[in-house]
């Protein structure tokens, strides 16, 4: 009880502190989970249903949007799982989807899923207070909406009110999911009952949602072409994991493309055993962290050439870092004197 009270006090302090008191690098605010303050009244964004694969995906939903979505999901299966891919705290104020927003949408980094969910539960203490929620532009608050909190609901509570299951895969935004979270998902997915339906979502319904939809399709199609799977996901609304070396991509975006292909290699090697070796163990034995000089060559099937040459042009958007897949090994490269 003492821990719960402490969490409640800290959460309230964060939510109610005037925005101008935050240092820019530590700024956290309540975000309405779409760019339009009235989006929660409209159609849910980035919805796609993949019938053959038994899954669907979307952006974050409001209470009203979830009611419509739940009706569709129940037509697909009696065994529906809502797979919440967000690390940042979120929930519903008066039915409106809101979340913590920090720099690079990075609120809650370092916290466990249990800690995050405990904070979300504790926010029922907001009832009766008035808060201001904002849309976000470049991770800064915009277009405030003042809300007198009459109702606070966690996503787990909302999901279970419709008779559905809830799974939290707490992943930070803008990067490939942590290895331990992928382990948890694969261990969950491999034991699903036949006919189960998974609905994935994150904030926008693209990056984190797409990563797990991609992994789930890979588990179902270990003999397919990885490029076909990645293209299928890109065509249906997931983040683009196809183009690995486009110069406009950030290091994190390029790394996601590489690690998606590495996960497919892992699945091909381990699905027949029922994934006795988990992803994080496999990656540990199939990865190398090295330092290279500009112009140095890495023999093997390279990221963009054969052999791989670490060059100014290759690393121009990666700030002296690269992640590449060479044969069956992932190389995490730091470029010296960049």
Q: Model features per residue range: what roles?
A:
Residues 1-24:
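Gram-positive cell-envelope targeting signals
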Residues 16-199, 211-291:
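Cys-dependent protein tyrosine phosphatase-like superfamily
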Residues 290-338:
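Extracytoplasmic soluble-region selector
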Residues 208:
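Conserved SAM/SAH-binding loop-helix junction
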Residues 3-4, 99, 112, 319:
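Compositionally biased, low-complexity segments enriched in small residues
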Residues 205:
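Conserved G/P- and acidic residue-centered "switch" motifs that form tight phosphate/ATP-binding loops
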